[in-house]
Amino acid sequence: LDSRKAYYGADDIGITKLDFDTRDLIDEIKSIKRKYDFIIIDSPPSITFETMQVVKASDRVFVPVQPSPVDLMATLPFLKIAKQERKNPIIILNRVMPRAKLTDAMILRLRYSGAKIARSRLSSKVIFAETFSVGRGVVDISVTSDASKEVINVGNEILRNF
């Protein structure tokens, strides 16, 4: 966030990073929900006390997943918990390699898990890492680029499913 603030020269960049006590996570999230239209909580897919609290306090659960066997194995238990909590998780495929047979196999396995898979996805593009490293997003660079269109499509799909 600091590099983004430095680049744009503004205190209000539309993103707020919050730190809070994870021992009282559900109450913390409820308090935050009153102040913002959307809150995004980034957490690993592993099953921990904190992850369980985040899922319980969430209105919706969107799960970015790289279509690889390792990511799939790490994500399946998380999806099970989200479904048990009736959050109807939606998978957003991330770092997708076009025309990769592995991608098709992983999509098939994710469908078998019963989770909904978003139509929109993010390809594996260097530009995502490059822009992030300087505190910017791909849409900041060029709103008409393929990467920007992917991000906009994912964002629109999230809004439609909220």
Task: Report residues per predicted region.
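Beta-strand-loop-alpha "switch" segments that mediate conformational coupling across diverse proteins
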Residues: 97, 108-137
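Inter-motif core of Ras-like GTPase G domains
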Residues: 46-69
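Conserved C-terminal guanine-recognition region of P-loop GTPase G domains, centered on the G4
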Residues: 72-94
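N-terminal phosphate/diphosphate-binding loop that engages ATP/GTP or pyrophosphate donors
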Residues: 1-24
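C-terminal boundary of histidine-terminating zinc-finger modules
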Residues: 132-150
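Structural beta-sheet core signal
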Residues: 41, 63, 91-93
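Switch II (G3) loop of P-loop NTPases
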Residues: 17-20, 29-51
